[in-house]
Amino acid sequence: PFQNLSQDAASAFYEFALADSVITELAQIRSIIVRPSSVIAKYQGKEVDPREAGRELRVHAVLSAGFIRAGDKLRVTAQLLDVVSGDILWSDRIDAEGSDILALQDGIAHRILEGLRLELTDLEAEKLGKRATDNAEAWEEYLRARDHFGRFIFRTIDAEDCDAAIACFKRAIELDPHFALAYSGLGACYATRVFKGLCEPEDYSYADASFSKAFLYDQHLAVAP
């Protein structure tokens, strides 16, 4: 997870959600293997040595990043570290308006690929160039939802966290009714409640309807959150 260097509680959801969204972006590239969000969740809120974490995860490189939000500005400092040699493969500082988190995420993913000197296929380049939504507010609600859902799945199993995720996914959909990832996330919430025995009677049908909407708006959706 990214480190919240400003210790701003209102921005804490970016810690897991930004890392999670970058993972989702990079997972579309066949030539690299990216560890899923489930394995990074345990590092959230902790001081972690990147090389030690990399050895534990059995990866060749680790992205280490921190962010500071001040007013409407968001600054991310990031570096990609070679786990074996300790060499920095890529490092950069990326500034963005707080309302343009989409551009920030896209920038991080593309600069990592540049640092690794990877050549993309035409289809991979097309996928990376396609935004899940152009609505910045919808994307922020989606990130909040992912943070709540990640907390529910990996840390608390508290129904309130899942309920909060559902509310955020629904707000994202209200802001962008064609937001496939938000429908997919909403479906995952309902399905997880069913699997964990926390469900309401209609949750199964809600999950099915949400996933159907997700694939209606994006038939190539690779990952259901």
Residue positions per predicted region:
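Acidic, proline/glycine-rich low-complexity intrinsically disordered segments
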Residues: 1-225
